[in-house]
Amino acid sequence: MNWKIAFVFVACAAALVAQKPRVVTLNVDVENAVTYRFDVEDPAKRGANPNLTTTILPNAFMEGIEVDDIVAVNGKPAKGVHAIRYMRMNFSPTPSPGQAIADMSGSFGDCNWYFQAQDGKFVGQILDGGLTVPHVVKGGAGAFYAATGEHNWVPDPARPTRNASVSEDPSRRRELGGGRYRVLFYLVMESYPEVEMTSQGPAILHADDWSLVNPTRPARAGELLVMRARNLGPTTPAVPPNQPFPKWTGDPLVVVNSDVEVTVNGAPAEVLVKAGWPSEVGVYRVDFRMPSGVTPGMAALQLTAAWIPSEEVKIPVR
């Protein structure tokens, strides 16, 4: 191998090794957490008791399902459900009779997370599981397409997860009450929300004439701007990821399901439109009004969708 080619190969390999994956943190708050243990054999009796129930302390091989409500993500109101299907083995290096011996403590389960925006629209799903925390994130859909990573959890000692019999009516879970806790996701995404870039900078346009925001035509406080963005997640109506958004024929635009936020120098901007860009594949339109009082100069702009922030971009402001 030519020494110059070898040098380039080694340099590129070193650069790839040096690159660290970008990790996104989601702090997910859940409430009304109830674990239903399969302590009743008769199917006719399952879910039939409208009253608060108790259950037996499980030995190994006890199956159960936990159901929780997602109420917030990163401090912002959200909706959704978290469901765990588990096999209680009670692994322990020093097991009591009826427990499973192992070199670690815990059990194992498979978790399913279904995230919704405040208005109930679908944002994304995450699948994870493991023998004990941290659980392994196995994948995702929607805004979390192909996500990997892990999660841990922080219990609330004042409101632990409630254990119930599978005979209890699950339609009354919120009325009867349950526990609450926080799950900390650390995700590596296949793609992240981003502001599209051009050779002259971010693809952010003046709404009055569709010219590019640049040093000769900077943005102004209070001005309406239009951003070209990518990776904002599912829309209504739904459009497959590899298909163009519908042509605009005067009908309402295809709207992004997740909450979309824009900040300029940390100040929130008013988002007026969050939609698929007609006839384009994977490009979204975000119309926003510049906040008042933005300091002239180069301003840091950041886009957030599905609680995932973009990298900051810089735009000139006068």
Regions found by a protein language model. Give the residues of each.
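Bacterial N-terminal signal peptides that target proteins for export
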Residues: 1-7
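Hydrophobic h-region of N-terminal signal peptides that target proteins for export
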Residues: 7-18
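Extracellular or lumenal secretory-pathway regions
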Residues: 19-121, 127
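A sequence-level detector for low-complexity, Ser/Thr- and acidic-rich stretches
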Residues: 20, 36-38, 54, 58, ...
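Residue-level detector of beta-strand face positions
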Residues: 69-70, 112-114, 134, 141, ...
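Acidic, glycine-rich flexible loop segments
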Residues: 103-171, 288
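Short polybasic amphipathic segments
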Residues: 111-115, 182-185, 202-205, 259-262
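N-terminal targeting pre-sequences for secretion and organelle import
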Residues: 165-191, 263
